[in-house]
Amino acid sequence: MHCPFCGAHDTKVIDSRLVAEGDQVRRRRECLACGERFTTFETAELVMPRLIKQDGSRQPFDEDKLRAGMQRALEKRPVSVERLEAAIGHIKHQLRATGEREIKSRVLGELVMAELQKLDEVAYIRFASVYRRFQDLNEFREEIERLAREPAKE
């Protein structure tokens, strides 16, 4: 680590602590050349897998697009921003946990539907109707009946 005061290359770590709920390491360092102390923060760089679309094209994971799609389904529904953000965090965690560099977009769609089902059943039906391309009222009815038969997921 370079000293921000004198530019020397040699520093020593005086103290290390976990911060940000264990997602970050805070280190107090001392420059061996000038004796100045400074603080650094370390976080893991977590790369999201790329998505393989149905047509075979590939695109990077876009958290904003995920959020917009979920917000559209949740429009005018009684779900807090905090619960939405927690669901997005859970989806991202599951994607990273696959350990894959690329995943089919279908996997992401299924994760979104599972989270929406836990958040709000109306939002789930809205999303599923677009995602699964419901063609008529019977497809809506079948999905609603299937949802009514399943035990609530939390």
Swiss-Prot record:
Q: What function does this protein fulfil?
A: Negatively regulates transcription of bacterial ribonucleotide reductase nrd genes and operons by binding to NrdR-boxes.
Per the record, the zinc finger regions (unnamed) lie at 3-34
On the tree of life, the source organism's domain of life is Bacteria
* Name of protein: Transcriptional repressor NrdR
Q: Which residues cross the membrane?
A: none
- Which stretches make up the ATP-cone domain? 49-139
Annotated keywords: ATP-binding, DNA-binding, Metal-binding, Nucleotide-binding, Repressor, Transcription, Transcription regulation, Zinc, Zinc-finger
Organism equals Pseudomonas aeruginosa (strain ATCC 15692 / DSM 22644 / CIP 104116 / JCM 14847 / LMG 12228 / 1C / PRS 101 / PAO1)
